[in-house]
Amino acid sequence: MEHYLSLFIKSVFIENMALSFFLGMCTFLAVSKKVSTAFGLGVAVIFVLGLSVPVNQLVYSLLKDGAIAEGVDLTFLKFITFIGVIAALVQILEMFLDKFVPALYNALGIYLPLITVNCAIFGAVSFMAQREYNFGESVVYGFGAGLGWMLAIVALAGITEKMKYSDAPKGLKGLGITFIAAGLMAMAFMSFSGIQL
């Protein structure tokens, strides 16, 4: 149990997808203007990561040498299968949001289908394969990585909302000051890097 707790804390804080590995920055910067929209996208990313990492772990275990038949190694197909599973989960999420939460579906706009090619999603799945997590570890890691990404985007959205009323220089208004805020947040999260779990 302690191992899973340390893996969860590590994936949320120490190895944060957005602020430590700088993955998923396109949607991270573009959707961080309002806390409500950022929260909705964060929940969507938690859903996709929480399901795609363990599902891809099961698929990857079938691709390994000798899993299907002796002497058959299909690990060269891992990237295409990872992308296929991620795309299917995002399609399911998109249909669900369109039917049951149309306000969030419209607010996310083009960024919802872009979760399919969000490098944070693919990065977490690739880390799972590289680190050879078992199914339980992949569930914890997927949920933790999604929660960490959501924590980062909601925090940045909160800062961005407050900065609308600040007296920032004209040249830094908008994306410029957002980059600075994201950089300062990343520096703050670097303080977790020395923690050994």
UniProtKB/Swiss-Prot annotation:
The keyword Calcium does not apply. This is Na(+)-translocating NADH-quinone reductase subunit E. The gene is nqrE. Belongs to the NqrDE/RnfAE family. It catalyses: a ubiquinone + n Na(+)(in) + NADH + H(+) = a ubiquinol + n Na(+)(out) + NAD(+). It is found in: Cell inner membrane. It comes from Neisseria meningitidis serogroup B (strain ATCC BAA-335 / MC58). InterPro entries: NqrDE/RnfAE, NqrDE/RnfAE_oxidrdctase, NqrE. Composed of six subunits; NqrA, NqrB, NqrC, NqrD, NqrE and NqrF. The keyword Endoplasmic reticulum does not apply. One of its GO terms (biological process) is respiratory electron transport chain. It comes from the Bacteria. It is a multi-pass membrane protein. One of its GO terms (molecular function) is oxidoreductase activity, acting on NAD(P)H, quinone or similar compound as acceptor.
